[in-house]
């Protein structure tokens, strides 16, 4: 397809930018000697899983459906070797994940046990949930390589199921710990170390030694952060969980590492991972989510109407914050918009405040002229550009994407493009009000007008089949 043939709204994922991000992650993996996993909760566009699998060691899942998706779709012909788990510089050998019991692409492979092509390297499939259902545990043990427990009670409640797999060398078992050291400011909803958090085992709740069968530790405390918060958190882990680090064979440093952000200290991360490996003789995992598809996707939307309001024009779009980019309302935040000169309530209020002044001469513009400019979306004193409010066509009054200063007020039919829309969008969207989900488009890495591939178009049946 060509760009002008695309429907709106549509998520467009850029293959070239994905590769750029993945090259950075591959460098970290190779230089640091660690393993890197895709956290599917942020980005689950399985059309590009084979590409990602060429660079990363596997995936992490937050539930059985994500684990099954990885088992079915995250496969490769070539890529980093994963199985069995490496021998570490310690006397006790780690538990290996058996290829014979690895997940299968389809029923035919399952019937032909042990017949996987030599070139096909099975990626690792990790899963963590705060609590597991009894009815799902056996299937998880069949398709996953690593199983993480959030409490000692959960570990023991499911021991009768997972222990035979663990003793047979078919699965690795770990505990999620709570370092009780918060590095978040202003986003308690995303802070696993916030007071009252249900996530992770506190030091006071740990037994004297790691429970039988447990060979790994895991913590996840970061959210869109750099290297320093990771180092700070791990120092807390060293201080409070040192004896368990000595027993463990691997540690998973969790999600939230913005490794592919331009200002991230990649060399520092490589050095830090090497330090952990050397000091504690541990296999180290990182499981970034956003970093895989950071700035690798856009959301295009069309202007359907322009409503004049008392402060600025309000544009009604065919995209919705509530339905298509839920984090805009949940965090909240103002998503980047291509061609925007400024954005956000704070920037608007700041500019409005700077524009309040008294005429110095009778020849200067009076109140009427300034009011006319403001009503046109152009605050007093602003030399160029127009402020507009971008909103949706749902019935939710608060379904507002944000305030933006643009070179001019867009017209009905114009296309607007939001940036960084590959992450936490497709995995969280919904059909409230019967809103259609955006198309999913892959922009292939080639110089051609027809480089746009329509991966998925959603329609009425997709809406209806979620209901009863």
Which residues does each predicted region cover?
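Hydrophobic "anchor" residues on beta-strands that sit immediately upstream
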Residues: 37, 172, 250, 283, ...
